[in-house]
Amino acid sequence: MVALTEDTQANANIGRLTVQTVEIADETTAIRCLDWDRERFDIEFGLRNGTTYNSFLIKGEKIALVDTSHRKFEKLYLEIVAGLIDPNTIDYLIVSHTEPDHSGLVKDILQLAPNITIVGAKVAIQFLENMVHQPFKSLQVKSGERLDLGNGHSLEFVSAPNLHWPDTILTYDHKTGILYTCDVFGMHYCDDQTYDENFFAIEEDFKYYYDCLMGPNARSVLAALKRIENLAIKTVATGHGPLLQVHISEWLGRYKNWSLEQAKTETLVALFYAEDYGYSEHLVHILGHGCTKTGVAVELIDLNTAEPQEVRELVTQASGLVIAMPSQYSLTAQAALNTILAAVHHKQAIGLLESGGGEDEPVFPLRNKFQELGLVEAFPPILIKEAPAQTTEQLCEEAGTDIGQWLTRDRTIKQIKSINTDLEKALGRISTGLYIITTKKGEIQGAMFASWVTQASLNPLGVAIAVSKERAIESLMQVGDHFVLNVLEEDNYQGLMKHFLKRFAPGADRFAGIKTYPATDGSPILAESLAYTECEITSRMDCGDHWIIYSTVHVGRVANVHAMTAVHHRKVGNHY
């Protein structure tokens, strides 16, 4: 288990790239492509620690390559593979799923090994035919089927659709006990340690990855866990981050517990998208992340591959529906839309968005049909006319939060009304100041009215803020992010409070009509605030329905030394 090779290249545009090869078991080599400086992986991930793209080579009597890598590693990766083995002798390329960060070099491998057989789910093979635009030998596999490489390497395939692509399969080697999982159980974390020895260093990234990619498909996670429960797993060979070996039972147990908690909710939102069309899947995942922040369950389903009965059952169960427009020329997707229209019921929540594929089903006629059937629009249609910017992605996440909050409004009202216990009344006597948190990350700005704020340390100077998991600003308050804590003045807070407490439409400018000036990091400072401090988030603690955000304070200023901070007096402790 020693690093055999390590090659590096640096590029001003993409940062430092490293390829590391490690023998992880008998006749099995990991090819880890380390992307040290990547700072962003869609809106879900503001990366603190880069990421990796992991590929694997199994040398039995026959040879199999499990996944490839991101196209940015083309030169390094192909040189490493050629150094390990003559590519023309590779018999099989197993494609766990067709997301470009793992299948980006499939076409290059085909050029080096034209007789190779590509192994994957039926949907994956179909997607690849549209990606590589050349004929290739293929083998479609289903759950429970095996591929014998010889020398004891019997590979068993496990179907895991919607984790987080519809074509996902897992691969288990019965000789080595290695389960190849691609995105499942992964994390965006880049370092030169092959395995998960440092549990606490990667724990937060593991949870964040689950929340963003796997949580929206909790039911599918549970189904996959059920299928692998009888496998004697010694190593989980993930597609991103360190391989899991030291703490396997803990990681898998957390996936199960998180998914059980997510799946047991009574409120379900069905998210329909068209795989491999426009930005459909990308935007729906972001929107689904916004939904799950409010405590509702979500289920993603591909309009191009789902069976009519599957669509009908999901629509019947769901309290809300979100549809990313498929191509108007896809007969399968059109049939799925007709099934949805026939299965919806009165007062379901509905949200529609374009996919930006150039041939989208027109959104407004479909919107009218749903309204005629008595469905309630959760957010205005989201129109996509160009490649989604950060602001568009923020709009989608906030739209997801909106539909989730609308569906859980009765639960929230019930909680507010349950104020009979002495404990809640006593807790409500804890008074705090009034503040507005403002932040900016790239093109995105956010703001939040807050009262659960306190100084938390003297050396270094630090503050702690409780942020509800369903707040829109939560995605902008990750470790390493910056924000401004604006302190409101006792006799001059009503206008700002009224403005920032109002309900904003998804993507709306929180600062329209408000005078601000930029902090050091660009976050807005409110001109009418009594005082402000510029803060950097250094840790987050999971506290039930809130995050406790601890931040160090770097800059501060008081506008009026004679004024007092506005104070928030409550009588009950079960709501703000």
Curated annotation (Swiss-Prot):
Enzyme class, UniProt record, top EC level: oxidoreductase
InterPro entries hit by this protein: Flavin_Rdtase-like_dom, Flavodoxin/NO_synth, Flavoprotein-like_sf, Metallo-B-lactamas, NADH_oxidoreductase_modular, ODP_dom, RibonucZ/Hydroxyglut_hydro, Split_barrel_FMN-bd
Any GO molecular function: FMN binding
Region of interest: Flavodoxin-reductase-like: 432-576
Chain positions recorded as Fe cation 1 binding sites: H97, E99, H164, D183
Similarity annotation: In the N-terminal section; belongs to the zinc metallo-hydrolase group 3 family.
Protein name: Putative diflavin flavoprotein A 1
Source organism (scientific name): Nostoc sp. (strain PCC 7120 / SAG 25.82 / UTEX 2576)
